[in-house]
Curated annotation (Swiss-Prot):
SUPFAM superfamilies: PLP-dependent transferases. The gene is hisC. Belongs to the class-II pyridoxal-phosphate-dependent aminotransferase family. Histidinol-phosphate aminotransferase subfamily. Its cofactor is pyridoxal 5'-phosphate. The modification N6-(pyridoxal phosphate)lysine is found at K208. PANTHER family: HISTIDINOL-PHOSPHATE AMINOTRANSFERASE, HISTIDINOL-PHOSPHATE AMINOTRANSFERASE 2. It comes from Streptococcus sanguinis (strain SK36). This is Histidinol-phosphate aminotransferase.
Length: 352
């Protein structure tokens, strides 16, 4: 590496691979196999390309209004970003500046640790229980803020709302960020708690429920004072982070939310069926409220099963460097026919 003063040494986030092969089954990055609403395709077809000569809007007013109506909040409780990763990254800059350690689980979304390191935010990883669950009392006491994915990733386990409220009630002097990337697939949202807890900030994405991972749109919800701080950070980095096309297509998705409710139910039904089939093969399957399952194979190592599935062009996620789940595979939930193919492949591999 070239030797120059001031270069930063960073341990970056490691994303799932993005293979591009014909006849593959891609179940490694929790994408929505059902695709966007037909209304999104219609909006794309009707988009005026002359609009692209302009800068995007600063506040995505129309999208905020549609989301607010859909979610039962006011527009001043919303901020739109370039994916929920953008919102979460800005949250670290906006909320975690006390000098005290920010708390998050030892087994969760890997970006939290990366952002803490990148922005020089002290942090402490709180071990999940032996059952991979969050224990609320572990988050009591002095800290500089808390961030929890609920349902958690990569475990898929949901923290009941009453337990989340215990954490909020015990930490009213700091911001508690709840990452709801997967809330569409099970569990109860923390949205009803916004009115009671001004220290609550919720993040959501269009990547999972709305099948728009390639578009990059996400949003945050919180007290207007928190949103004001977030917008100040956004305007200090890139006020035009949400492009016009993304805003237009995300709006079309919100306006056809019944479509996503239907596909969400289909994913949940397929997930529960698939988890049951894996359990019948003596796999240890964690109870998931997401669009994936985390499972420990029986009679074969996770590494071997991962390799043999890949040889069949079936891509799942393996975490060899995560000690607590190095014997597990995370498998996204596709359409029923895809999952039947995956199950048949697993049965064949395990019986050979």
């Amino acid at each position: 590496m070239v030797k120059l003063k001031g270069l930063r040494q960073i341990n970056p986030y490691v994303a799932g691979q993005q293979p591009n092969e014909r006849d593959m089954i891609k179940l490694n990055t929790n994408e929505n196999a059902y695709g966007p609403s037909p209304k999104v395709a219609e909006a794309l077809q009707n988009f005026d390309d002359q609009e692209l000569r302009k800068y995007s809007s600063l506040d995505q007013t129309e999208l905020c209004q549609a989301l607010a109506a859909n979610l039962g909040v006011s527009p001043d409780q919303l901020i739109i970003g370039n994916g929920s990763d953008d919102i979460l990254s800005m949250a670290f800059l906006a909320f975690f500046n006390s000098g005290e350690s920010v708390l998050f689980p030892d087994l969760t979304y890997g970006f939290y640790k990366v952002w803490a390191d990148l922005y020089h935010v002290p942090f402490r990883e709180i071990p999940l229980t032996d059952d991979f669950e969050v224990h609320p009392s572990d988050y009591f006491g002095d800290n500089g803020g808390i961030i929890l994915a609920n349902p958690n990733a990569p475990t898929g386990i949901y923290l009941p709302l009453e337990q989340l409220e215990e954490i909020l009630a015990s930490n009213q002097d700091v911001v508690v960020v709840v990452d709801e990337a997967y809330i569409h697939f099970g569990g109860q949202s923390a949205l009803p708690l916004l009115e009671t807890y001004p220290n609550l900030f919720i993040t959501r994405t269009f990547s999972k429920d709305a099948a728009l991972a390639g578009l990059r749109v996400g949003y945050g919800l919180g007290h207007p004072d928190l949103i004001a701080v977030m917008k100040a950070v956004k305007d200090s980095i890139n006020p035009y982070s949400v492009d016009l096309l993304a805003e237009s297509l995300a709006l079309a998705a919100v306006q056809d939310w019944d479509y996503y409710l239907e596909t969400g139910r289909a994913i949940q039904e397929t997930r529960d069926w698939f988890a049951g089939e894996l359990a019948a093969l003596d796999f240890q399957v964690l109870t998931s409220q997401t669009n994936f399952v985390l499972a420990q194979p029986s009679g074969i190592s996770a590494a071997e099963l991962f390799q043999q599935l890949e040889e069949r062009r079936i891509y799942v996620r393996y975490f060899p460097k995560a000690e607590r789940i190095k014997d597990f595979l995370r498998i996204s939930i596709g359409r029923r026919e895809e999952m039947e193919t995956v199950l048949a492949a697993i049965e064949e591999i395990c019986s050979s």
